[in-house]
Amino acid sequence: MAYIYGDTMKIDTTGASEATAKQDKLTIKGVEAPKKLAEHDLARGEKYKNMITKVGKAKKMDPAVIAAMISRESRAGAVLKNGWEPAGNGFGLMQVDKRSHTPVGAWDSEQHVTQATEILIGFIKEIKVNFPKWTQEQCFKGGIAAYNKGVSRVTSYENIDVKTTGLDYSSDVVARAQWFRSKGY
């Protein structure tokens, strides 16, 4: 299957920060931490695998990235109450922010995952316009960072995660995606 937004396995990553790793009381950081975090979410996320794969195929988006974002955003649904995060702004497995978008579908539905994937694709395209000299993989990672904090906060590739949650959002998601790929996503 051709994923038109870039090759996840070619995206550089520094992994997760110590703060992100501490979510699961991990004492490791870097590239190993996201693998452990994703592993902890795998059993919960397996029930969504067919849906993730279907949406990925339809949108030409790597399903491993969708799975990784579900892991990072909601821990495969574990942190949600009635589909919402504790502050009440993010909805669903992929945490569509109601302040910027009108969430559609049930929190764990194909409609929701499709909407969130389309939002990610829009960010990747905006990053490509803003940084026309970036490689496709750099734009992919930039789009992931923008999904977390907005396009205007992505100002350079070197500082791609400086304004993201945990100061590691795109690197963490990429490392989780690379791990999910090894699990058949």
Curated annotation (Swiss-Prot):
GO terms for molecular function: lysozyme activity. It comes from Cyprinus carpio (Common carp). Keywords: Antimicrobial, Bacteriolytic enzyme, Glycosidase, Hydrolase. The lineage of its organism: Eukaryota, Metazoa, Chordata, Craniata, Vertebrata. It comes from the Eukaryota. This is Lysozyme g. Its EC number is 3.2.1.17. Gene3D superfamilies: 1.10.530.10. Belongs to the glycosyl hydrolase 23 family. One of its GO terms (biological process) is peptidoglycan catabolic process. It catalyses: Hydrolysis of (1->4)-beta-linkages between N-acetylmuramic acid and N-acetyl-D-glucosamine residues in a peptidoglycan and between N-acetyl-D-glucosamine residues in chitodextrins. GO terms for cellular component: extracellular region. InterPro entries: Glyco_hydro_23, Lysozyme-like_dom_sf. It is an enzyme of class 3 (hydrolase). The active site is at 73.
